[in-house]
């Protein structure tokens, strides 16, 4: 039995997970410098111990409903192909151990977040967790 550890988080009422091996750290409202004329989903850049990190508004990137910045917002710092990227999310959940056999492929006939950016879907007692494909989100 192979286990996958997910860092789960929320954007509005939507629950998502990222493979914990991709997560470097989670920051609470770091200072962010806006970048003029950047894409609408780019929040700006932050200084992470001397490293410049681009911060993405994950709600905007996934074309989900905008939620106002709040005290529960967090920035998940991920490592993708030796580059650090920050993903701003509404709130963080838990680290969820998942049997890989319980992860289903995303539906092939669906557009939107699950069709474009999910590498899998996990059914839970409370609904579905979309497991994000970090490389697809950053492409």
Task: Give residue spans per PLM region.
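An acidic, low-aromatic, low-complexity terminal/linker signal
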Residues: 1-139
């Amino acid at each position: 039995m192979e286990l996958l550890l997910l860092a789960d988080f929320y954007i509005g009422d939507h629950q998502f997970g990222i493979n914990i091996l991709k997560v470097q750290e989670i920051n609470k409202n770091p200072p962010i410098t806006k970048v003029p004329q950047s894409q609408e989903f780019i929040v700006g850049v932050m200084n992470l111990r001397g490293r410049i990190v681009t911060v993405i508004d994950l709600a905007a990137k996934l074309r989900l409903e905008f939620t106002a910045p709040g005290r529960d917002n967090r920035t998940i710092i991920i490592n993708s192909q030796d580059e650090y990227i920050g993903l701003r999310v509404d709130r963080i959940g838990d680290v969820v151990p998942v049997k890989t056999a319980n992860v289903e492929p995303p539906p092939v006939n669906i557009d939107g977040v699950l069709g474009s950016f999910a590498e899998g879907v996990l059914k839970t007692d409370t609904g579905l967790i979309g497991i994000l494909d970090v490389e697809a989100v950053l492409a």
